[in-house]
Amino acid sequence: MAHFFKENSSCYFCFRYLENPVYLNCGYICCFQCLDSLEKSPEGDGVLCPNCSVVSLKEDIRHAKQLRNLVTTVKDLEPQLNFILTMDPSMKIFQVNMILDVDTAQNNLIISEDLRSVYHTSQTQDRKKCAERFDPSPCVLGSSRFTSGCHYWEVVVGTSKEWDIGICKESINRQEVVYLSEKKGFWTVGVRNEEVYAASTDPLTVLLVNPRLHRVGIFLDLLEKSVSFWDLGDGSHIYTFLEIPDTEPFRPFFSPANTYPDEEQVISICPVMNPSIFGLPVNPV
């Protein structure tokens, strides 16, 4: 994936593509020119690793010529990678006309009348008690239940500063604090503080995402055992989870911000728009 290649070809210090990469004693990688920006050792005869504080003397620092050649190749291939990973419009033939399942909504979540939008509030809602409902985590599931085939849906995240969307196993424990992780049965992407995007791998995978991200396309392919996320603003690829298990049903997952009580941080499921225009079938709920 494009973001994978770029992430693994980037300087640990400046986060740009590596230029004349070098290794420190501990294996830390950075650009040769970034060495001058690293903290000096107390004796002044070496530099400290920003991660582990191991001292590297001048003679310890090794140039990574093979890595430099690899990074050059990755940079040259980036336009092709981005083109290959641009969203295929034909995914939309699998679009699902779903709504939010109110019976799963945690009681601080407000669900719109059309059952497509959700935001968090400090006021507790008076809803019936049921085992399907999340408590205490501010989450809600989509009405669809996926066991096979391909499925696609779109979510407007708008200007929300914090959110998580994706899929989860139907069997997840909803009566405990939710920790988003593949190991826990969640395959999601999300954002914190308007700027830190991450995928729910273990450990988390930080994502390079357009900060103007407004609308996300999600494509679940149970034939290939994968779920992919796309920025619908420019069609670029955000992240793909591979080798997801298919031993039980999946549900669409949504969690709006709960750290901004004075603002309505709304996320919304997009309705299917006039499928007859394309003369193509649309998946039922």
Swiss-Prot record:
Cellular compartment(s): Cytoplasm; Nucleus
Q: Which residues form the B30.2/SPRY domain?
A: 78-276
Presence of keyword Cytoplasm: yes
Keyword Zinc-finger applies: yes
Describe, by residue range, where the zinc fingers (RING-type) fall in the chain.
Answer: 11-53
Q: What PROSITE patterns would the database entry show?
A: B302_SPRY, ZF_RING_2
Signal peptide residues are none
User: Biological process (GO) annotations?
Assistant: innate immune response; regulation of gene expression
**UniProt keyword annotations, A-Z:** Cytoplasm, Metal-binding, Nucleus, Zinc, Zinc-finger
Q: How does it assemble?
A: Interacts with PSMB1, UBE2A and CCNB1.
Can you say what this protein is called? Ret finger protein-like 4A
Native organism is: Rattus norvegicus
